[in-house]
Amino acid sequence: MAFSVGSVGCLLGPVSRSAGLLGGRWLQGSRAWLGLPDTRRLPVIQQTRGRTRGNEYQPSNIKRKNKHGWIRRLSTPNGVQVILRRMHKGRKSLSH
């Protein structure tokens, strides 16, 4: 099955003529020739995933009482000043 130069030119002849008639659009990779939508014009819907926010504060009653409680306030001189300052200001709640 040896092809001669004339038979190859005959095989490529209609392709080159259709390319000339179509303006070379088949070389641009247009998907319209395959019956598929052109994906370059469709909007890209992409889900953005970042770090979750809003869950930084996880309250602990034990830590709250240890840091700001009555026993802790009275155990240091500065804590006593905090209690006296709040009493002088008229606070109903002096500590946790």
From Swiss-Prot:
GO terms for cellular component: mitochondrial inner membrane; mitochondrial large ribosomal subunit. One of its GO terms (biological process) is translation. The keyword Phosphoprotein applies. One of its GO terms (molecular function) is structural constituent of ribosome. It is found in: Mitochondrion. Keywords: Mitochondrion, Phosphoprotein, Ribonucleoprotein, Ribosomal protein, Transit peptide. It holds the Pfam family Ribosomal_L34. Gene3D superfamilies: 1.10.287.3980. It comes from the Eukaryota. The modification Phosphoserine is found at S75. Residues 1-50 form a transit peptide. Belongs to the bacterial ribosomal protein bL34 family. Component of the mitochondrial ribosome large subunit (39S) which comprises a 16S rRNA and about 50 distinct proteins. PANTHER family: LARGE RIBOSOMAL SUBUNIT PROTEIN BL34M, MITOCHONDRIAL RIBOSOMAL PROTEIN 34 FAMILY MEMBER. This is Large ribosomal subunit protein bL34m. The lineage of its organism: Eukaryota, Metazoa, Chordata, Craniata, Vertebrata.
